[in-house]
Amino acid sequence: MTQTPEALTTEQFKQAIIDKGQYYHIYHPFHVMMYEGKATQQQIQAWVANRYYYQINIPLKDAAIMANCPDQRVRQEWIQRMIDQDGEYPDGGGREAWLRLAEAVGLSREQVISEELVLPGVRFAVDAYVNFRRRASWREAASSSLTELFAPQIHQSRLDSWPQHYPWIDDKGYEYFRSRLSQARRDVEHGLTITLDSFTTFEQQERMLEILQFKLDILWSILDALTLAYVHNEAPYHSVTSKRVWHKGLFK
């Protein structure tokens, strides 16, 4: 009879989570291209427009966690993430800040909000993440947020490199990245506490690490879709038309 491996200690488990950072999308060639100043304006615009679809789904995936969570104290803390992104009326929060980034890179907010530039591969990846959060237990869903461990580095990298490489981007567009530096660190502290307290057997810890890898897969796949369309010029249906004929806004 095979003996079940012993659970990782808290520190070992935390380190295993941190080690997943080697697969974070900061290392994706598309992000490296943007960081090194090698991206065209069209490529920057495409990233901003497609990432908008991820941004507007952040409150939905956080609401899914809250809907499944019976712990009032957890909900009281988690709701701040929704407020950060949606804002408190009439403030538009992170969503509005992202639209200012879109304008800063030369897009119109109407074009971005229409989602006409959102690639199917990006839409499928984001939808898969939201649907996972709806179906998973609240603890598992919360643990998938721990890619935020690596987020301050990626936001700082944009603040460090983009103004130098892309002087045509209006400085007001960087507000979102600046705000997320502190927000992400706060969110990580809460999410990490939940995760370390919730997954205490080897099987649970192994599953949680797979969940985190799933989230990393989502982020990487988004950039894969952008690379295919805007680096290799192979957008969906490129072999038969140059028009953006893929579905848009079907599930609004």
Swiss-Prot record:
InterPro entries: Haem_Oase-like_multi-hlx, PqqC, PqqC-like, Thiaminase-2/PQQC. It comes from Acinetobacter calcoaceticus. Belongs to the PqqC family. Keywords: Oxidoreductase, PQQ biosynthesis. Ring cyclization and eight-electron oxidation of 3a-(2-amino-2-carboxyethyl)-4,5-dioxo-4,5,6,7,8,9-hexahydroquinoline-7,9-dicarboxylic-acid to PQQ. It catalyses: 6-(2-amino-2-carboxyethyl)-7,8-dioxo-1,2,3,4,7,8-hexahydroquinoline-2,4-dicarboxylate + 3 O2 = pyrroloquinoline quinone + 2 H2O2 + 2 H2O + H(+). GO terms for molecular function: pyrroloquinoline-quinone synthase activity. Its EC number is 1.3.3.11. Gene3D superfamilies: Heme oxygenase-like. Pfam families: TENA_THI-4 (PF03070). This is Pyrroloquinoline-quinone synthase. GO terms for biological process: pyrroloquinoline quinone biosynthetic process; sulfur compound metabolic process. Pathway: Cofactor biosynthesis; pyrroloquinoline quinone biosynthesis. SUPFAM superfamilies: Heme oxygenase-like. HAMAP family: PQQ_syn_PqqC (MF_00654).
